[in-house]
């Protein structure tokens, strides 16, 4: 254990979940494809969680559009159609970016849109993945 100086009575501990997440991020930022997904328990509405599950299915180094995700979700929910804006709202509320790869979703015309951490980071992540 370690006692911090700001909170001297707080004990920090190691967690397998944090260790797995760190290992996943280390592999990812070395430019390799992690062959596992750390335990994820994001909180959100049922709809958002469904969208985030679709994000996890986008292959490393590939992209999809908000419109394509909307079409998949409409089929999944047995609806005639769904708006790309609804999908964008769920993607924008992704609480675990990078691991849940919202950076792999682009505009219909190929534009880099809607990344809360900045478009330059989205471009960086896609460039990193394109090298593999």
Model-derived features: where do they sit?
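Major-groove DNA-recognition helix of helix-turn-helix-type DNA-binding domains
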Residues: 91, 99
């Amino acid at each position: 254990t370690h006692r911090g100086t700001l909170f001297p009575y707080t004990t920090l501990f190691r967690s397998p979940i944090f260790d797995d997440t760190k290992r996943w991020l280390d592999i990812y930022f070395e430019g390799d494809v992690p062959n596992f997904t750390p335990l994820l328990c994001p909180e959100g509405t049922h709809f958002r969680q469904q969208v985030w599950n679709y994000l996890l299915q986008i292959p490393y180094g590939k992209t999809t559009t908000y419109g394509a995700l909307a079409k998949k979700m409409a089929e999944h929910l047995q609806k005639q159609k769904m708006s790309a804006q609804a999908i964008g709202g769920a993607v924008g509320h992704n609480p675990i970016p990078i691991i849940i790869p919202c950076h792999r979703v682009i505009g219909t015309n190929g534009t880099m849109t809607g990344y809360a951490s900045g478009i330059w980071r989205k471009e960086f992540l896609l460039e990193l993945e394109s090298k593999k």
